[in-house]
Regions:
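Fold-independent oxyanion-binding glycine-rich loops
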Residues: 12-14, 34-36, 62-64
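Active-site/ligand-binding loops adjacent to catalytic centers
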Residues: 1-30, 76-119
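Catalytic phosphate/nucleotide-handling subdomain of diverse soluble enzymes
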Residues: 42-104
Length: 119
């Protein structure tokens, strides 16, 4: 889906993700697992952008799992112990060199670079 240009890949700091997850939990009664908190934060960003611009959009996000098995991450966030890692593009590129390329029909699955977004 990313390769087809149908979705964007962005980087969102952990604290923003967990803030969105707590708002979601308060409103929906579901504690999200840490993984979907990124999608929730992106949906919140999109909704706020629409609020500012006056644009009306349907915003869809996915929620997988629940956070009951990873409450330690929520505890770190609530106690102010969570940090946002701000890795440089060079550090990320170096780390990506050790990740094996998985190909489908001899074509790498990821051709376009992921983009970092500023907060």
């Amino acid at each position: 889906v990313y390769e087809l240009g149908l979705v964007e890949a962005i980087s969102i700091p952990q604290k923003e993700c967990f803030a969105g997850a707590l708002d979601f939990a308060r409103m929906e009664g579901i504690v999200p697992a840490p993984e979907p908190t990124h999608a929730i934060a992106a949906a919140v960003r999109e909704a706020l952008a629409c609020k500012i611009s006056g644009e009306e959009k349907v915003i869809l996000t996915a929620l997988c799992g629940h956070g009951h098995l990873d409450l330690a991450s929520y505890e770190k966030y609530l106690n102010g112990e969570m940090i946002d890692a701000d890795l440089s593009d060079d550090v990320i590129s170096k780390a990506m060199e050790s990740v094996p390329v998985i190909a489908l029909d001899n074509q790498p699955l990821l051709k376009r670079p992921l983009k970092k977004t500023a907060c």
